[in-house]
């Protein structure tokens, strides 16, 4: 670790502690050249995968887009905002746990549908009708049969 005072690369770790939450490591360091002390913090950087769209283009994952899609499907439905937030967190945790740099948009859509099916059946059908491009009443009937 480079010293922030003299920019020397030779530093010693004097003390290491894990935060109460267990997600951060605090290290107290001393520079071998100027003898000044400083503190560093280490955290895991969690990066959600890029989304590969149906046309092959790649876009950065957007928490806001996921949230707006869920909220649109759940509009005027009796589902609390806390439940929506928990569903978003579950979807994002699943995306992170896959450990992939890229993921097809279809996979994200399936995760959303799984959460909506759990939250509200009407919202599930709303989302599925757009996501799966329902063209006729038979498509709706087929999706309704899946729910039974």
Swiss-Prot record:
Binds 1 zinc ion. It holds the Pfam family ATP-cone. Keywords: ATP-binding, DNA-binding, Metal-binding, Nucleotide-binding, Repressor, Transcription, Transcription regulation, Zinc, Zinc-finger. A zinc finger (unnamed) spans 3-34. InterPro entries: ATP-cone_dom (IPR005144), NrdR-like_N (IPR055173), RNR_NrdR-like (IPR003796). It comes from the Bacteria. Signal peptide: none annotated. Its cofactor is Zn(2+). The keyword Zinc-finger applies. GO terms for biological process: negative regulation of DNA-templated transcription. Residues 49-139 form the ATP-cone domain. GO terms for molecular function: ATP binding; DNA binding; zinc ion binding. Belongs to the NrdR family. Negatively regulates transcription of bacterial ribonucleotide reductase nrd genes and operons by binding to NrdR-boxes. This is Transcriptional repressor NrdR.
